[in-house]
Amino acid sequence: MELQKIEQILKDTLNIAEVYAQGENAHFGVIVVSDEIAALSRVKQQQTIYAPLMPYFSTGEIHALTIKTYTVEKWKRDRALNQFN
């Protein structure tokens, strides 16, 4: 599965400021920047982010997904500290 497709699915279905996907061979990770999602419990965050991607788990296009969530403010701070683009 292409990284851009994962990003686009999440952008189209969730209220997020930014999303970044990485990985290959059905093992992916996403960084989701959203005040709304970051405010949820960790379990709710996972459920919310997994939901639009579930069809791709069923087909095997995605086997594993790691999730990191940030508020907009925390992402700005961490990105500056870690020199993310």
Curated annotation (Swiss-Prot):
Domain of life according to the entry = Bacteria
The UniProt family comment states: Belongs to the BolA/IbaG family.
The identity of this protein, by name, is Uncharacterized protein HI_1082
Organism annotation: Haemophilus influenzae (strain ATCC 51907 / DSM 11121 / KW20 / Rd)
